Amino acid sequence: MTKALTGVRILDFTHVQSGPTCTQLLAWFGADVIKVERPGVGDITRGQLQDIPNVDSLYFTMLNHNKRSITLDTKNPKGKEVLTELIKKCDVLVENFGPGVLDRMGFPWEKIQQINPKMIVASIKGFGPGPYEDCKVYENVAQCTGGAASTTGFRDGLPLVTGAQIGDSGTGLHLALGIVTALYQRTHSGKGQRVTAAMQDGVLNLARVKLRDQQRLAHGPLREYSQFGEGIPFGDAVPRAGNDSGGGQPGRILKCKGWETDPNAYIYFITQAPVWEKICDVIGEPTWKTDPNYAKPAARLPRLNEIFARIEQWTMTKTKFEAMEILNKDDIPCGPILSMKEIAEDQSLRATGTVVEVDHPTRGKYISVGNPIKLSDSPSDVQRSPLLGEHTDEILRSVLGFSDHQVADIHKSGALAPPQKQAAE
């Protein structure tokens, strides 16, 4: 079956996490992603956080599935010639270099457009135009500057970054959407264009409910936040609110049976108004259904600490899965806190391809995240990540059409090998 992006060729100059997240998603949908890497070195994540000596790390393998790898010294004259030919043959160039790197490489936007007017150049940067645009950004920096950290954590504690990589992977997903949108527009315009996703912008987009709450503050306290019920005044910025629900329905993380020894024996519980009476029955407080102090959502807001303490008395008598089963029967919103171990072993996630097993020639079998987006007419399969330069000759021949003699000349030029160090005199 033909995949959604079959026929689209991506020139992938990305590294670490944000860019590879984008290009891996495109590869899962069928694009031919050619990962350009430095000879002898490759993507820096090949050697980062290695759990097995002398093999590609999981950091690399889990972000570079379904790609082909070519090594190329873009400072070498012959390497520049090869890159020029690749630009002619590809639809999209994706990069997450620091500002100005493509220009210094000798391939600014204007030159790329001369070489291939239909090429889309997609970039991830830390910040958009402004006072910070030249600053280096990593995952946690993006979370801190995009509004996530200042609104995550508990009111009396430090700002916190999340375990989810919303800065890197989140921005990569934003860029992928930008690329397919530009590809669609090209079917009408016949022209390429630049696509940019800034990490600060991506994090803010994912934290939009907090920007919503910032504006609500001008009209009064945020009543669904715990501190309202505790009588603590609000300041001029959205506060950290612990595990309060962000959707207007009060919610908390509560202890379950076994919490003393199991760090993940917890459940998230939402006191949604339409099921309040069912909640009262489940926890053994039927009088709360008619008591004016508890019957209506507005009356409950100042008493949330008391209410959740009572609910927790009930959840502590059940495992998180027992509690979930009971609550789901009454459509009471909840969710167990699942550890990564539990997720890795979840057979339903295996069945849907969200968690997959991959066999790698040097590190053996490992599990990874598959495509989280399912298309009924474009199934995704997860193929192992490439070894460094594994497809160099294949790409030179099958994509660029070089003859054996031309390929040999390129090898002799040093364009595909690490630069030779000058011997000391």
Curated annotation (Swiss-Prot):
Binding site for CoA: 17-18, 38, 72-75, 96-98, 104, 136-139
Superkingdom, natural source: Bacteria
A single MF term (Gene Ontology): formyl-CoA transferase activity
Pathway: Metabolic intermediate degradation; oxalate degradation; CO(2) and formate from oxalate: step 1/2
Record field: catalytic activity: formyl-CoA + oxalate = oxalyl-CoA + formate
Gene3D superfamilies, per the entry: Crotonobetainyl-coa:carnitine coa-transferase, domain 1 (3.40.50.10540), formyl-coa transferase, domain 3 (3.30.1540.10)
Active site: 168 (nucleophile)
Its EC number(s): 2.8.3.16
Sequence positions that bind substrate: 247-249
UniProt keyword Coiled coil present: no
GO biological process: oxalate catabolic process
Database matches in InterPro entries: CoA-transferase_III_domain (IPR050483), CoA-Trfase_fam_III (IPR003673), CoA-Trfase_III_dom3_sf (IPR044855), CoA-Trfase_III_dom_1_sf (IPR023606), Formyl_CoA_transfer (IPR017659)
One Pfam family matching this protein: CoA_transf_3
Family: Belongs to the CoA-transferase III family. Frc subfamily.
NCBIfam families named in the record: oxalate_frc, PRK05398.1
Matching HAMAP family: Formyl_CoA_transfer
The protein's role, per its UniProt record: Involved in the catabolism of oxalate and in the adapatation to low pH via the induction of the oxalate-dependent acid tolerance response (ATR). Catalyzes the transfer of the CoA moiety from formyl-CoA to oxalate.
Subunit structure: Homodimer.
Protein name: Formyl-CoA:oxalate CoA-transferase
Organism ancestry: Bacteria, Pseudomonadati, Pseudomonadota, Alphaproteobacteria, Hyphomicrobiales
